Amino acid sequence: MPVQAPQWTDFLSCPICTQTFDETIRKPISLGCGHTVCKMCLNKLHRKACPFDQTTINTDIELLPVNSALLQLVGAQVPEQQPITLCSGVEDTKHYEEAKKCVEELALYLKPLSSARGVGLNSTTQSVLSRPMQRKLVTLVHCQLVEEEGRIRAMRAARSLGERTVTELILQHQNPQQLSSNLWAAVRARGCQFLGPAMQEEALKLVLLALEDGSALSRKVLVLFVVQRLEPRFPQASKTSIGHVVQLLYRASCFKVTKRDEDSSLMQLKEEFRTYEALRREHDSQIVQIAMEAGLRIAPDQWSSLLYGDQSHKSHMQSIIDKLQTPASFAQSVQELTIALQRTGDPANLNRLRPHLELLANIDPSPDAPPPTWEQLENGLVAVRTVVHGLVDYIQNHSKKGADQQQPPQHSKYKTYMCRDMKQRGGCPRGASCTFAHSQEELEKFRKMNKRLVPRRPLSASLGQLNEVGLPSAAILPDEGAVDLPSRKPPALPNGIVSTGNTVTQLIPRGTDPSYDSSLKPGKIDHLSSSAPGSPPDLLESVPKSISALPVNPHSIPPRGPADLPPMPVTKPLQMVPRGSQLYPAQQTDVYYQDPRGAAPPFEPAPYQQGMYYTPPPQCVSRFVRPPPSAPEPAPPYLDHYPPYLQERVVNSQYGTQPQQYPPIYPSHYDGRRVYPAPSYTREEIFRESPIPIEIPPAAVPSYVPESRERYQQIESYYPVAPHPTQIRPSYLREPPYSRLPPPPQPHPSLDELHRRRKEIMAQLEERKVISPPPFAPSPTLPPTFHPEEFLDEDLKVAGKYKGNDYSQYSPWSCDTIGSYIGTKDAKPKDVVAAGSVEMMNVESKGMRDQRLDLQRRAAETSDDDLIPFGDRPTVSRFGAISRTSKTIYQGAGPMQAMAPQGAPTKSINISDYSPYGTHGGWGASPYSPHQNIPSQGHFSERERISMSEVASHGKPLPSAEREQLRLELQQLNHQISQQTQLRGLEAVSNRLVLQREANTLAGQSQPPPPPPPKWPGMISSEQLSLELHQVEREIGKRTRELSMENQCSLDMKSKLNTSKQAENGQPEPQNKVPAEDLTLTFSDVPNGSALTQENISLLSNKTSSLNLSEDPEGGGDNNDSQRSGVTPSSAP
């Protein structure tokens, strides 16, 4: 029975007794069949036949010469000249001796593999020959030259060695970088395609799945089947690419094709290819054949990497290559080598090998070939010795790749463990190709190299994780290259931004939700650049969990994070706005950062930072500018970035204490907590935000809406009037459907004029801007560090100028009322009742704030996102631009108009909760023109009070006289606006006019002036709006008359009535919204400017029902207007 042949690497031991050959008892005797056995085992054979292939041994064993080549490899003494009796003459003997000498010399290249038991193979003794060359050389060494069959085998082995040598030389002259590209180019040139190891394997398995049962399918059906199955895992799969894979199999003749008349042919898989192994082998064979046709010579290990992505299929590929070899392939390879040498100049003079190679190529490899003569044998072996020597010489002296050319690419485990074969057996059959270490020195060398590579890997991994979280790696990695991971110590903010400390996440959104708002997800900060000053990387790096509680929830009400977030110790508001910081892409989403205001000096004017991008005060802050995500505009850096609102709240609304760290960081979305430069909201939005009429500069810049804005980028033409630092602060790009994007202001010219008047009034108020702390006694007002001078017209510039950190921290929505209004996402008119009485607002500021939050949430939940002029999807969080809880820390934007969002009833709110917004209500209007900006309560400067006059509803009322005058003016403006609104209502008879009015009213909601017609929330149809407009117009006529009568009433009464009326109006149908005028009046009347909570609103509505009736002409008209504008008036208690 045949014995299993040993591994070719065990050529130094007897395959029968497994003992190493020696020169005494176990002399190696080679048989004509190519097997070598020790003489002792041969003598014990029962039959004179090879124990492995049963070939008969015709020659006397004693006459067979010892294989001296193997003896020299085992270190044994080679016997001197052995008598050869099998040679017919002296000449033959001479040829024999020369041939044997050639074999012995070639065998020396096997010395590194010479011992399976201890000679050892290490990095210095590894053979320069490749594994295929060594294997072919072993075959040659085992040939018995005295036997005729042995000589035939020796010639074939010599030819094979010569052919492999040519291939090796061609490989040495190839550019490995171009090898794969040349291969796939050749494959594509034949209408085929390789999709990569994993995808190609799946595609082939699916083809087999469809056809293994013998079914016949058309090519189209087969391709569709494969594509549909591949799509879940490989979305890039296409009919074209899969069709090319099928073409590859078709080219390989794997299908039995049945043609049909006037119909597509049917393809049936041939029976021999209905297993994956057979199909894959034919597939691989076809690719190898294409490569050979293209003149490419690729090593088996390279094939394994290309087709399988590993090194475990080298033998498989080698067998395919061998089968594809033809007698003509050798001569063709010689020609290709000649061409390659001409291209390189042949520095090693390899052309001298050409005659020898041609001689070897002319050897007939067929088994039926006649046996060679002794002379032919000698010539053939001399030629193969010459070409192998030439190859070794070239590899050692001229090759750039050297002996390691076949080594697979290094990876993390490459040669970091000892080779098992080397340890156990003292030698490794894989030689230089082994991926394990063969010596301790080699092991230590690669382990050290691996350690150097490790740090980079974790970084990329951490970046990948951050990306998964939604943080762009650019935002994560600042120019400094520091990666700020939550676990890592937050590095100082780049570009002069001071990190507030690990406890406060600088990038925390103002939203209450600790989790990043999906819209705010860092991943959405696509435009943030690592180099952007105040780039999120550092800011993001340490996001305290407490801060995380201040997640960038665009919709969520600002978290009452102050408690959660320790006040940031930032003296200066962090400058989160990069100079050209991509952090604040034009499409900046509101990046919510903690408002570490408490730590920062309250209202410290934020000087424009060098890196900060400041837009002219009148212009909308770049933050609102929404450049294409690809080119995020650096938001105007507010020196006082919105101080983390958390700190504001933590500081008990001591604005001064909380630096405005992130104003620029907060992008387009208006957060109740951030102060935005008077955003160019649709006036409706502004009206909604605060009853106080606010001049809203026409939106010159696309709204700042972050990602959600991105959808509306072109629509976003709104820019805050003054780029308040807070307004500017880019926030994480949000896509919150409710991102607070004021609808583009579309007020009629008259309304614009009214708004301008309001702005003037607000400017005056701001000049006086000593806003007594909002009635929210409970919350200590942070002393505003605002400089009254700076707050005036500079408000537009406030973002950069406001030294009062609080202002910079204030966001238009920063005020409690406003915050809640904003929190309600423009607190919907329904939800928000215009605060008519300042006292009520003050008294119930907290409770109302909570109610406002509820209202805001509801409003946000309502499908009417009136503020969003861009479409059904609201840009502002459904909970309000600033929906926040009393604890939410709001960073006051720079001196921004402090206005109570009309929907936000002012409650006695802990300013600490809204620390940035002393008068929450008034500040909520901060989105308005900076003139209306209101310093934090308790810290309001006179200017603040002035702004509070209008913001009176937002903050403490100005001195009664001034207040009343301002109120009168505001009321007049409101009446005018309402009248204009009525006129518009008449014009709105047509649906288009109605829609425009609605947009205006929406805009008006955000500001006292009649809002431009913003897009109505998708909830309200144009027909409904038109009907409402007609009704409103009728009511307006009535109320106008009533108002004229009521105008006679004292201004105080009017303000109170307006407030109460707004409170009631805030209750009206969502469609009915308080006109901007009413809102402004109510806000001016309402000291805190904060919207009443629903309960307070209900109470106010009940109490003021009679007042409303009397003031309905005015308030009702306004309400109707506001309804048209889509804003619900909010009443301040």
Curated annotation (Swiss-Prot):
This is Roquin-1. GO terms for molecular function: CCR4-NOT complex binding; double-stranded RNA binding; miRNA binding; mRNA 3'-UTR binding; mRNA binding; RNA binding; RNA stem-loop binding; ubiquitin protein ligase activity. It comes from Homo sapiens (Human). Residues 1096-1110 have a biased composition (Low complexity). A zinc finger (C3H1-type) spans 413-441. Residues 1058-1070, 1119-1133 have a biased composition (Polar residues). Residues 174-326 are annotated as: ROQ. Pathway: Protein modification; protein ubiquitination.
